[in-house]
Amino acid sequence: MKPKIGFNTDVFVEDSGRTVTRMNILYSDLIIQHGGIPVIFPPGVLPQEVASGLDGFFLIGGDDYKSSLPASGEIPDRYLEVHPRREETDLNWASWLIKSDLPVLGVCGGLQALCLAAGGTIYGDIESEVKDPIQHRRMGKGDLPSHIVQWQGFQEGGLPPGSFEVNSSHHQSVATLPTDWRILASTSDGIIEACCDPAERIIGIQWHPELNREEPLGHFILNRFIEQVRSRLELDSA
């Protein structure tokens, strides 16, 4: 039996004024190639109504959540607000997933949604809030490495600690982790590039394995997520 993995989607207002929901096909291709079935949810769907048929969930990247803005309300120059319907849906899903037993992988904005929902905080703009930051916004193609991260590793083992190039591109990031969460990878300026909950069931990364199929760290994490999903499915089927 193939595992069913849920996805959130983006909301975009076209030049014509028409509002559409969409998702980069590379996300679903990634899951199909790993033997899964993508189940794609538009904004407004309540997780408690549909999640019983899922074996895992993948929170995709996107623009900036209004919830990430500082208490002062100051809006960074690089701020690109995600559509309000998407923000509401993403944070509903993230809150529900944190309380569930589903394996979860969040990429870029998906990582930030999980941290916000679990009680963490976000830098609204790295360049204006972090001292001496490195370049986190990629200037070239999306599949190209942008900087190096220091990987700390999972408690259970697997890929050992080391340095890896990743195709990260973002101007926001996790500032403080939710209680008991821990850093999996970070950059030389201290920015968190990957983290997990205490059980290592919920994983978030800032970079994009869907854009680069050759990048080893992202695909180690993706393969581990798929293994967790399959293990859960086998237990449910036993």
Describe the function of each predicted region.
Residues 108, 170, 208:
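Active-site glycine-centered loops adjacent to acidic/histidine catalytic or metal-binding residues
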Residues 169-176:
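The feature captures the conserved acid-bearing segment of alpha/beta-hydrolase catalytic domains
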Residues 1-105, 116, 123, 127-157, ...:
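N-terminal beta1-alpha1 cap of cysteine-dependent amidohydrolase-like domains
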Residues 181-189:
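Short, Gly/Ser/Thr-enriched beta-strand-loop segments that form substrate-interacting elements
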Residues 107-111, 118:
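Active-site loop->helix "elbow" adjoining a glycine-rich segment at hydrolase catalytic centers
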Residues 111-113, 132, 173:
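Short, catalytically relevant binding-site loops at active-site mouths
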